[in-house]
Structures are given as C-alpha cells and as structure tokens.
C-alpha cells in the first residue's frame, strides 16, 4: 500500500512482480494471478487516479511476466470519516511445480556454502520499511520495477533450482537484504558471515534498501565458479556476499547477532504489540 500511495503505477507493477518472485523462489513456473483491489471512494479524483494507475501497473506487469489475471474482485468506497484507506491491490499467484523434489526453500541448508545476491542493488530507500520504522519517515518514490530484469533474473533462479545448484532461495522485498538473510538464518538455524557493504553504496541503503528483481541464493563451493561464470556470460548481476556458518549473522567489522536473539525479536513482536508493549 505505501508504494501505491506514493506511485500507483509502480506500486501496481510491484504487487504483481513480488507475487511472481514468490512463486519463482520455490522453483515453480508462474501461471496466473487473482487480484483483490481495495481502494477508497472513486468519486474523488485522487482516488480514481490511484485506481487507474495501479491497474495500468498491474496490466503492464502481467503482460511482460506472462502472468495473466484469471479472477479477482474490487472493493471500493473503503473509508472512515471521509478518509480513504491506502490503495491496496492484493495479488495472489499460482504456479506449477513439475517435481516437488526439485523445489527450494529459504532455509540455509549447510555451513560453508556461498551466499549469492542476484539482481542489481542500488540501495533504494524511498518508501522502505527501514525509512518508516527506523527513521520515522514516510517519503520518497518507491523503487522502480524493471519488468525485463524481473523476468530475466527470475528465469535464471528457477533454472538454478531445477538444476539443483541452488540449495536455498529467498526473494527480496520488504526490509531488504539483511532482513531476508536473517529469515534464512532463522529458518535453517545456521548463521552467516557477510562481507561489508560495497563502498559505492551507503551501508543502510545496501542492507535495507528495497530494490526489486533480487534474490538471495546459496550454492555449494563445488558449483560456485560455474554459477558465477554462467551468470556473467548472460549478464545477470550476481555477487558473492558471504558464506553460511556459525550461530549468528555477522557483518564484517560489526558485532555478531545471535540467531537466538533474532528469533526472539521476530517471534515476540506480535504478542508484544497486541499487549501494547511496542
């Protein structure tokens, strides 16, 4: 919703692209979507503008990703005391997995595996969770969605899963790279030792930016050079950012954060929020 409020067109594209990445990240071929379009009063020009912009973005993404809408519904006039809800296009995607034994999960599988970041990272913080929750700011443009890059990168990741070279896969979205890595570490109960952010990108943008069309993939050492060479040959951005191992997530030059501590924060947030402790 925050993306759509700032830029309905890009927000509509992103909603479809994220569903496409979710299906891709398990190794399935994305087939179709259902949409649930929730907006305020369309008799107000600004609300109708949001609705039309989001639909244009959804349509563009569906065409490029070959991910058609096969069902859906629309809910309008959602407002309280004259104030409309945030524009919320909800997208559900379905895909086909030919062989469930060749599917992927986000959990780190073993120590000593290479962690790869696939897709271009610029450190885009506009409308990010980091900007909102850490900095207390809701501003800027959302990250642009390059649909051609989404298609290319996703097809490559799906091929890696089917070939058995990807041992764990997680698509990046809310919270950015470091949040995804923490989720992978918690799921597998295996830590990660990470390289520092590249000098060309500010650290908070690198770790928490929400650039689109990206995945974290782990591969065995025996497959690493082959994977890097193949992706370089087809001009898919890919860089090794660290290795799995240990009982903490550690960035070079920083203090480690134990998986146990991450899990406690993750699992306690909702109960604490409902109890009014946050």
Regions found by a protein language model. Give the residues of each.
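Generic structural signal for well-ordered, non-membrane alpha-helical segments
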Residues: 5-12, 16, 47-55, 84, ...
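Glycine-/charge-enriched secondary-structure boundary and capping motifs
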Residues: 54-61, 65, 70, 74-90, ...
